[in-house]
UniProtKB/Swiss-Prot annotation:
Source organism of this protein record: Bacillus subtilis (strain 168)
Pfam families named among the record's database cross-references: YmaF (PF12788)
Domain of life: Bacteria
Full protein name: Uncharacterized protein YmaF
Length: 137
């Protein structure tokens, strides 16, 4: 069996894995948000161009948060046989001035064109691979 770093060279036999990510959004309306989480698992190696789906909610800043969804770029090989992915997306809209709601609620109503809104761009790389055991374990 030929191996390349963590994964067998036959990507179809590579175990499913996920990646951690931690990215700061662009600064808009005087603030930025942090996003962090884990991609959805996918089978793949460092050379097969696989991608991962990611989704989440930004940090709560300036009285609001944003939703985001995306698909990572293809696997980018590293010298040690592992890989990373680039992520780039735009958040969903939120109001510039949040609505006072006691128990949570609407972040953005697309039917309300009277209130100004904004969004942020996020761009970065995934981090370490998570969710699989070492080969031969």
């Amino acid at each position: 069996m030929n191996t390349l770093g963590l994964y067998q060279s036959d990507w179809s036999k590579a175990p499913p894995h996920a990646h951690a990510y931690h990215v700061k959004t662009t600064r808009e309306q005087g603030h930025y948000h942090l996003i962090e989480g884990f991609t959805q698992p996918a089978n793949g190696s460092n050379t097969d161009q696989h991608t991962h789906y990611y989704t989440g909610i930004t940090s709560f800043e300036n009285g609001h948060f944003h939703r985001y969804y995306g698909i990572s770029g293809p696997a980018i090989p590293l010298a040690d046989g592992t890989h990373y992915h680039e992520i780039e997306e735009t958040t969903y809209l939120a109001y510039n001035e949040p609505i006072e709601i006691q128990y949570g609620g609407v972040v953005y109503d697309p039917g309300d064109d009277r209130r100004k809104t904004h969004r942020h761009t996020l761009k970065g790389k995934t981090r370490e691979i998570v969710g699989n055991e070492p080969l031969g374990w």
